[in-house]
């Protein structure tokens, strides 16, 4: 029996799945973040090693140093350029050579697959390698691949340069609308009251204290998108316009990916991933209606599997290639 590791490494945590050649998950391990560009190589390597060890410990099989693990796929945040891939492959090889991985043989270079976290999200979401992943959580990005293996990325430029249609984008637009109404220069909206109540503020001027002086980051601000979503679901016109604008941005990015990968006669799947899609304002439904107009044969789906499972599938593909 052959085994593989599938690893999903992000800025918050690292997940490793131990899978067999029949695509059965035998073990799962979690550790800290593994974005080497923000943490450094050593800390990223430690998180990956720990996630692997924990996956093996949780496996329902007898595990020893002779476990026949033949391939590994690491889908990591911030990995996209050839240089990034070389760096990750090097430190995985280093883990093998220092005997810090419980494997019976050194992996061939082709069996150390390194790709972006978007790629494994697509494969995990659809269960195969073709289609489009529309990811909208704290940030946003669209990533697709066609049946010929051509890939297309749209967006993903971060909260300063991009991330249109993301939770952060929605939250910032909502906060700005609330403050404009508070100033008397904006359209009336219940967002002002909702933010004030949710954050426990005496007035909206205290937002300065919350956002700037408490050192709120992108993730904390993005969490406020739920307030905008709820206000839109309750019929607030300003909030609804913000949600519509966010969906329009995601549609534009998706349309760009489609035009670069598929033609009008092809059927393919579009998987929606991230917290924005699960709100009360029916972002998913709005998105589906718009997609049907630009890609009639496309099917919008929810993720079938998690990204780490997608990494495992890519590792298995490496064995069969």
Please identify what each model-predicted range represents.
Residues 36-38, 78-79, 156-164, 297-302:
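A short glycine/serine-rich beta->alpha loop
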Residues 128-186:
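Glycine-rich phosphate-binding loop of actin/hexokinase-like ATP-binding domains
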Residues 55-96, 104-105, 113-114, 123-126:
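Short beta-strand-loop/turn "lid" adjacent to the catalytic site in phosphate-handling enzymes
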């Amino acid at each position: 029996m052959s085994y593989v590791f599938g690893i999903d490494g992000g800025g918050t945590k690292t997940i490793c799945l131990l899978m067999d050649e029949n695509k059965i998950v035998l073990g799962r391990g979690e550790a800290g973040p593994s974005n080497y560009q923000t943490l450094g190589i050593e800390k990223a390597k430690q998180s990956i090693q720990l996630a692997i060890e924990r996956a093996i410990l949780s496996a329902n099989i007898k595990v020893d140093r002779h476990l026949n693990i033949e391939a590994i796929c690491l889908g990591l945040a911030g990995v996209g350029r050839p240089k990034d891939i070389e760096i990750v492959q090097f430190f995985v090889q280093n883990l093998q050579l220092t005997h810090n991985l419980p494997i019976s043989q050194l992996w061939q270079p082709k069996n150390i697959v390194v790709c972006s976290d978007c790629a494994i999200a697509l494969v995990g979401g659809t269960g195969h390698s073709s289609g489009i992943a529309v990811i909208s959580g704290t940030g946003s990005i669209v990533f697709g691949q066609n049946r010929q293996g051509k890939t297309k990325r749209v967006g993903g430029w971060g909260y300063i340069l991009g991330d249109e249609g993301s939770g952060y984008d929605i939250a910032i637009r909502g906060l700005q609308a609330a403050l404009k109404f508070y100033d008397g220069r904006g359209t009336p909206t219940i967002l002002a009251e909702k933010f004030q109540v949710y954050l426990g503020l005496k007035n909206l001027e205290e937002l300065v204290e919350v956002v700037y002086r408490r050192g709120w980051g992108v993730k904390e601000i993005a969490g406020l998108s739920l307030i905008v979503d709820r206000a839109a679901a309750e019929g607030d016109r300003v909030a609804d316009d913000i949600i519509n604008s966010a969906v329009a941005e995601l549609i534009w990015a998706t349309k760009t990916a489609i035009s670069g990968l598929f033609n009008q006669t092809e059927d393919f799947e579009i998987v929606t991933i991230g917290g924005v899609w699960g709100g009360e304002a029916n972002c998913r439904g709005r998105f589906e209606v718009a997609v049907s107009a630009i890609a009639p044969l496309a099917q919008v789906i929810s993720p079938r599997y998690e990204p780490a499972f997608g990494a495992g599938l890519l590792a298995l593909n490496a064995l069969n290639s």
